[in-house]
Amino acid sequence: MSSSSYRDSYFQYRHLPAPHHILYAEWNQDILALPDEVANITMAMKDNTRTDAEEGRAPQDGERNSNVRESAQGKALMTSEQNSNRYWNSFHDEDDWNLFNGMELESNGVVTFAGQAFDHSLNGGTNSRNDGANEPRKETITGSIFDRRITQLAYARNNGWHELALPQSR
């Protein structure tokens, strides 16, 4: 047994006692493809398969993915259509930007949503207290990303910070 494997096992014993801790440690080292790249690859593969089926022949391995190439990173795939935003068109851009702009996700699954605080008064106006240079203070929501109550609270606060905009689950 080499000394490096002893150190690795000791580190895992002391610092990564649960299986999901090891998973989070591996996530920190992953390089993931952007959603646009994944969508473009899927579309390119469907187009190649459809063209081959129309011609009535089976595709050869070398020509099936001729318009899809691997990037230098090795994990992300690229296509000739680099500036497509089809993936993002299905989102409400302003709401999603407000929700995810201040979000921080740590490797242990703790998420922090930072948002602009609003006064919960009847008039629904912005925070009217004297906060220095009339800037609204920031509120944060912190908790486990796997706890649905945390994400629901962040979503509700994102949509006005004073009204619940989520549909009731039944």
UniProtKB/Swiss-Prot annotation:
Alphabetical keyword list: Cell cycle, Cell division, Meiosis, Mitosis, Ubl conjugation pathway
Pfam families in UniProt: Apc13p (PF05839)
UniProt biased composition (Basic and acidic residues): 48-67, 132-141
GO cellular component, as recorded: anaphase-promoting complex; nucleus
Pathway entry: Protein modification; protein ubiquitination
GO BP terms: anaphase-promoting complex assembly; anaphase-promoting complex-dependent catabolic process; ascospore wall assembly; cell division; protein ubiquitination; regulation of meiotic cell cycle; regulation of mitotic cell cycle; regulation of mitotic metaphase/anaphase transition
Family: Belongs to the APC13 family.
Role description: Component of the anaphase promoting complex/cyclosome (APC/C), a cell cycle-regulated E3 ubiquitin-protein ligase complex that controls progression through mitosis and the G1 phase of the cell cycle. The APC/C is thought to confer substrate specificity and, in the presence of ubiquitin-conjugating E2 enzymes, it catalyzes the formation of protein-ubiquitin conjugates that are subsequently degraded by the 26S proteasome.
Subunit-level organization: The APC/C is composed of at least 13 subunits that stay tightly associated throughout the cell cycle: APC1, APC2, APC4, APC5, APC9, APC11, CDC16, CDC23, CDC26, CDC27, DOC1, MND2 and SWM1. SWM1 interacts directly with CDC23 and APC5, and is required to tether APC9, CDC16, CDC26 and CDC27 to the complex.
Protein name: Anaphase-promoting complex subunit SWM1
